[in-house]
Amino acid sequence: MFMAYATSLRSADLSRQIGVVITKNNEIISEGTNDCPKSFGGLYWPEICRDGSIQDIPSGRDYTLGYDSNKRSQLEIIHAILDNLKIEDSPDNIKAIKKAGIGNLTEYGRVVHAEMEALMMCARNNISCKDGIMYATTFPCHNCAKHIIASGVKEVIYIEPYPKSKALEFYINEITQDETEKDKKVLFRPFMGVGPH
């Protein structure tokens, strides 16, 4: 779990920093953090320039853009709803629509989630994660959960809860938190032990 936490420290995501490692036979086979994807695989990381300075590629990571594309898209949807319904574009109305669930949308972000990056790292390197164990600093979102299920990972161990996740609601036949069902479903369980921070 310490390695998952250490991986999370590399993230420059504007909303939260998450780290993941996948193990198989007690060895780490991949890692992932949430950040923007780079062409031909992997994520954007700072690069060493000819003058020795370390810099991020302009427009590579979200913080270099100066905005979060997911939050921007949420606001565009909210304003479109208000315009189409001919409702006043006021802070109270925006807040009410966000509370209705639009504020929980995650699919408009440029960032690859840490769980997805760890699975993609396995795919890029022709490593099977079937029967692997995923260690995550946060409970996976429902989008990541479906890919975890499909990948063949048998267990997910996490530190922090993620109340926005609908994974347990959407995948009642595929995910369990009951250890007695771990032979039939993917086990999602909280980390027990000395925490990494």
Spans of features found by a protein language model:
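Zinc-dependent deaminase catalytic domain
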Residues: 1-197
